[in-house]
Amino acid sequence: MVLSEGEWQLVLHVWAKVEADIAGHGQDILIRLFKHHPETLEKFDRFKHLKSEAEMKASEDLKKHGVTVLTALGAILKKKGHHEAELKPLAQSHATKHKIPIKYLEFISEAIIHVLHSRHPADFGADAQGAMSKALELFRKDIAAKYKELGYQG
């Protein structure tokens, strides 16, 4: 799967808006993920106790993790598909230590698309959504290949 230069520009344009409030975006994305796919919360020992949206919003740890997730994703997106160096350690930790299934990466991708659309409707129309979906699918496909190399079926 290849994105055109124009598609990458759409992705990176909206990503600049994410980076302007990376903590807020990360928090919103994780809350949406955990609310719509509560099974994903079980992978996070330090968040399992957070049962309500209010508790999630009050959690500094959750906000910090959102920053970590989006910082890593931003570094990958900025490589425009040439993300081997960034992907390798991420795949290693997610396959061997955290055991995060690819399905969960699909779930967080859905949350990312939803949050970006709700926060930036003028900058995240159908073309930008399509480009971001392709970029996230490329990321998932490549991380799934790394998982396979590591012997994790995820």
Curated annotation (Swiss-Prot):
Compartment list: Cytoplasm, Sarcoplasm
Catalytic activity entry: Fe(III)-heme b-[protein] + nitric oxide + H2O = Fe(II)-heme b-[protein] + nitrite + 2 H(+); H2O2 + AH2 = A + 2 H2O
A GO molecular-function annotation: nitrite reductase activity
Binding positions (O2): 65
Enzyme Commission no: 1.7.-.-, 1.11.1.-
Any one of the GO CC terms: sarcoplasm
Modified residues (Phosphothreonine): 68
Globin domain residues: 2-148
Principal place of residence: cytoplasm
GO biological-process terms attached to the record: removal of superoxide radicals
Domain of life: Eukaryota
Binding sites annotated in the UniProt record for heme b: 94
Binding-site residues, nitrite: 65
Pfam family, one: Globin
Family to which the UniProt record says this protein belongs: Belongs to the globin family.
Function: Monomeric heme protein which primary function is to store oxygen and facilitate its diffusion within muscle tissues. Reversibly binds oxygen through a pentacoordinated heme iron and enables its timely and efficient release as needed during periods of heightened demand. Depending on the oxidative conditions of tissues and cells, and in addition to its ability to bind oxygen, it also has a nitrite reductase activity whereby it regulates the production of bioactive nitric oxide.
Protein name from the UniProt record: Myoglobin
Gene: MB
